[in-house]
From Swiss-Prot:
Residues 203-218 have a biased composition (Basic and acidic residues). Ceramide-binding protein that may transfer ceramides from the endoplasmic reticulum membrane to the cis-Golgi network membrane, and is thereby required for the biosynthesis of complex sphingolipids. Residues 1-18 are annotated as: Peripherally associates with membranes. It comes from Candida glabrata (strain ATCC 2001 / BCRC 20586 / JCM 3761 / NBRC 0622 / NRRL Y-65 / CBS 138) (Yeast). PANTHER family: CERAMIDE-BINDING PROTEIN SVF1-RELATED, SVF1-LIKE PROTEIN YDR222W-RELATED. Signal peptide: none annotated. This is Ceramide-binding protein SVF1.
Length: 443
């Protein structure tokens, strides 16, 4: 009972959690052990949950053009803090991985008068709609004049999820958990449409590192009270990017639900997708904090151009040539992602027998030299959330984003290596391995 009370309290307040142990996390990977883990998604899998307790729910369309190297995403974020404050945001990123100094734009815009209708989402000047056949999304956003988006995303392969219920639950009762994590995917799709961007001319020639340093300086000035507004006339460069029917971009789409405070659910994430003309590979992986025994939950997907070849959970993401950066995280300079499992055609008895004929392996590896941005998460969240999270010792969340269309390659089993475009996100949230009294300090 004490642990249940502590769990409920921490879910509301955001303080660090006690060390519950392995029995207080019920992973989706454990439930599919020894079985065929691949399940095709239905339209209902993409209905918004929108519960009345603390949660963050997102849909993200990751677009990438193999020919030009342009990569990015359009994302809707719907959040609820303690059941008292509901908000929605449209975030957008576009990055030219072959010419980073020419195009690297980020926008984040608060949504007004938003509403949910099953799988669809609406707000002023924004709509996301899934067709009745569960084969196509249409995203239109005019909420920010710097990033006007009109994209149609059409499935090339079936949707995919891990197991019948793709959720990981936190707590001592699976039927009444105090937290959860869930992901469902459309791994390989075409993306047709148009994106209009307005890029500040003074940042058009700056590298991601220079922009990050400039942002840090601005934040330091704000903290020191130097917040007097300086009137400046910003000149923009307008660009229109078109993804045509004859030369579409690829898209990886994911819907995610996190039903608890982010620093309670995970202490680190590895996320990657890779597209080539023949294949797609996806990794979504998180590791829990010490309070849930540093448990790793890993979801991998391998496709060809028409089919899901495998959904896997015996995966690894190796951080290579690591180096401690200016904020203190040990950031990799290279990554190697390996997915191992059984072909989607294998039956439960085939998986249990573990015969070689049903096994499959895929590897994506490459250098993490082309950084899109190092995102200081605490600099992006509202102040009232920041005050809650900053009270937890060892919590300093940063997301490292990388995009590369030239130096990553994919290998399926012992086949030939194929080049393609990769997007990688390495996220560090908390470093504390020991729960101490200081962890509960909210001052």
């Amino acid at each position: 009972m004490l642990k249940w009370i502590q769990g409920g309290l921490s879910a509301v307040t955001g303080i660090a959690e006690p060390e519950y142990g392995k029995e207080y996390i019920h992973t989706v990977t454990e439930r599919v052990e020894g079985k065929q883990p691949y399940r095709e998604t239905t339209r209902e899998d993409f209905f918004w949950k929108s519960p009345d307790h603390t949660n963050v729910e997102t849909v993200t369309f990751y677009f990438s053009n193999l020919a030009t190297g342009v990569v990015g995403f359009a994302q809707i974020i719907h959040s609820n803090i303690i059941g008292l404050h509901t908000a929605a945001q449209f975030t957008f990123r576009i990055f030219d991985s072959k010419n980073p100094e020419k195009l690297n734009l980020w926008t984040s815009t608060k949504l007004e008068n938003f509403r949910i209708e099953d799988a669809n989402f609406y707000a002023d000047d924004l709509s996301v709609e899934l067709n009745a056949d569960n084969t196509q999304y249409r995203l239109i956003s005019k909420v920010n004049e710097q990033s006007i988006v009109d994209l149609t995303v059409t499935r090339l392969t079936p949707g995919a999820k891990l197991g019948d219920d793709p959720s990981t639950y936190y707590g001592d009762n699976v039927e009444q958990p105090w937290g959860s994590m869930r992901h469902v995917f459309w791994p390989r799709n075409t993306c047709v449409g148009e994106i209009k961007v307005k890029i500040p001319k003074e940042t058009a020639e700056k590298t991601a590192e220079e922009q990050a340093q400039e942002k840090e300086q601005q934040e330091e000035q704000e903290q020191e009270g130097e917040d007097e507004a300086v009137e400046e006339t910003i000149e923009y460069e307008e660009r229109t990017l078109k993804f045509g029917e004859d030369d579409p971009s690829y898209c990886m789409f994911v819907m995610a639900f996190q039903g608890m405070k982010p620093h309670h659910a995970a202490k680190a994430w590895n996320f990657m997708f890779f597209h080539s003309k023949e294949n797609t590979m996806v990794l979504m992986e998180f590791t829990t904090p010490k309070s849930y025994s540093n448990t790793k939950v890993s979801i991998g997907i391998i496709t060809n151009d028409k089919e899901i070849l495998a959904v896997t959970h015996d995966n690894s993401a190796l951080h290579l040539n690591q180096e401690i950066d200016s904020v203190g995280w040990n950031v990799p300079k290279q990554i190697r992602v390996e997915l191992k499992g059984h072909k989607s055609s294998a039956k439960d008895e085939d998986v249990e027998a573990d015969n070689d004929e049903h096994k499959i392996k895929a590897v994506v590896e490459g250098p993490l030299e082309n950084m899109v941005e190092r995102i200081d998460v605490m600099g992006e969240v509202p102040n009232f959330v920041k005050n809650i999270v900053s009270g937890v010792a060892g919590t300093k969340p940063y997301i490292y984003q990388f995009g590369d269309a030239e130096n990553f390659h994919f290998q399926l089993d012992d086949g030939e290596k194929k080049n393609g475009l990769a997007w990688v996100e390495v996220t560090f949230i908390s470093e504390s391995e020991v729960v101490t009294e200081e962890s509960y300090n909210e001052e």
